[in-house]
Amino acid sequence: MLAGTRLLAQSPVVEVPLEFHDGHGLFAPGYGGVNWERGPNDNDWYKTYQPVKGIPASWKDVKKGNIWIDAHQFAYQNYRAGLLQADVYQGLKEGWKIDTTQLSPKPIRCFVYVVTGTTSDGKQGVLVDTNHDLDFTDERVVYPPTMLSIWKTGPLQEAIVSLPADFYRGGQVVTYPVKVLFALSDGNVLYNYPTYASASIRSGAKPSR
């Protein structure tokens, strides 16, 4: 075992360029749930909610919430803004192992607001605040397919929304495009990021150091 460890330690590091693709590739996709807003009772996140506008008046059973693109950054910036209690944040910091040296001290676009409801034609629609202005008036209605249909046919482009998001890298805030795929499971709106990477290396190629 020790000999194998020494050999591994002496092996050169191989750097392989990645190529990113839309979809899930050969991987089984996982999904997350939207953080829907709820009342103030026993709700540590209540003060982090922001008012939005532009929700169609004809929609019924409307729910409003957000997706945390970077949950660590979201918790940290709301704590610094006084919108998340210190004891709650400290618990998250320990449980999530939040490293504040890797996070922006100023608020950035690390989340996105989402609303869902029953449209006038009886379908379940989703609106995403892709330009982060808290106004859904100019947003495209997405009709999420069921997870079963996605498993059979793959991600549907009309169920994918693209938006800019901010990240803290190397002491600077950088912006990257993020794609979000929405799906329905028993009426619940779920999402994931339909992007995967591939790499290839020629047999006998010399690794870079």
Please place each PLM-identified region on the residue numbering.
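Sec-dependent N-terminal signal peptides
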Residues: M1-A3
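Sec/Tat signal peptide C-region and signal peptidase I cleavage site
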Residues: T5-A9
